[in-house]
Each structure stands twice: as C-alpha cells, then as structure tokens.
C-alpha cells in the first residue's frame, strides 16, 4: 500500500465542535475562535453551517460569523450545507468551499439528516451543480 504524499486537515471546531453545545456561543466568540485558528496557521477551517436553526440553533448565526471573520489569503473557510437553501446562505456568506454530509447506514442517515441515503444524494445533486457553476469547491 502506498501512502498519500500529503494530507488535508480541516479544523472543524467552529462548526462540529460547537454545534451540540447546550448554551449558545455568541457570534463574536465564534469569530474570535476562527480568527485565532487562522492566525495560528490553520489553512482549512469549517466556520459554520447553513442548516435549519430549529434543528441546530447553535449555527443560526453562521452568516454573522462568516461576515465577521478576518479572512486571510490562502485560507479556506468552508461551511456545511444540507440543501439548496443552505447553499444560498453559503453563497451569500462568500464561503470558500462547501461541505456536504452523507451517511453510510440508513439508520444514521435518518437520525442525522432526517432522510434516506437515496434522498440525501438527490438533495446533494443540485447543491453540487450550483456550487460548480459558481466555482465553489465541494467537500464531502
């Protein structure tokens, strides 16, 4: 087996690390976190997600976070999007990259994104097409 010549590490703390916190973390603190990660050399940062605030209230301020961060050349600021509505938010927020998420099992898919694997793939298709038409890379 040949190992890859390089590895891409994506810092997920501002999104995955905070999304399940019971107490809402204010946008200025999230902005400070992203800025500190940037200043400490992280090149790929998942800064938020454009999901339903009903399901993930912690991410309701992702547009404010994306608007408030001090972007640095060479750093990719991505956001997670589950559907076209999320993509529109990511586009307006000038995300450098979007992330989509899927599941390997039907049970996890239903629990995590409230649909079957087949339905999730159908949702991702227009998101990926829209991202490509706007020159936005997709990770997932």
Map each language-model feature to its residues.
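Active-site mouth loops of central-metabolism enzymes
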Residues: 10-30, 75-84, 109-117
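Glycine-enriched alpha-helix->loop->beta-strand junction motifs that scaffold or abut catalytic
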Residues: 41, 92-98
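N-terminal glycine-rich anion-binding loops that anchor highly charged ligand groups
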Residues: 3-11, 30-48, 54-60
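Catalytic cores of alpha/beta
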Residues: 83-94
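Alpha-helix-loop-beta-strand connector modules within alpha/beta enzyme cores
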Residues: 55-79, 118-140
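N-terminal small/glycine-rich loop or linker at the start of catalytic domains
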Residues: 1-22, 58, 99-112, 135-140
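Conserved beta-strand positions in the central sheet of alpha/beta enzyme cores
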Residues: 44-46, 78, 99, 139
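Glycine-rich, proline-tolerant flexible connector loops at the mouths of alpha/beta enzymes
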Residues: 43-68, 102-116
């Amino acid at each position: 087996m040949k190992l890859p010549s390089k590895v891409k590490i994506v810092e997920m703390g501002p999104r995955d690390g905070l999304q399940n916190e019971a107490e809402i973390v204010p946008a200025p603190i999230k902005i400070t976190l992203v800025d500190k990660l940037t200043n400490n050399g992280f090149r790929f940062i998942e800064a938020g997600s454009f999901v339903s605030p009903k399901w993930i209230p912690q991410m309701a301020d992702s547009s404010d976070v994306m608007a408030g961060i001090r972007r640095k050349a060479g750093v990719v600021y991505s956001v997670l999007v589950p559907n076209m509505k999320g993509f529109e938010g990511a586009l307006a927020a000038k995300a450098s990259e979007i992330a989509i998420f899927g599941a390997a099992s039907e049970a996890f898919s239903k629990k995590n994104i409230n649909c079957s694997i087949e339905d999730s793939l159908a949702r991702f298709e227009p998101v990926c097409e829209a991202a490509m038409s706007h020159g936005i890379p997709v990770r997932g």
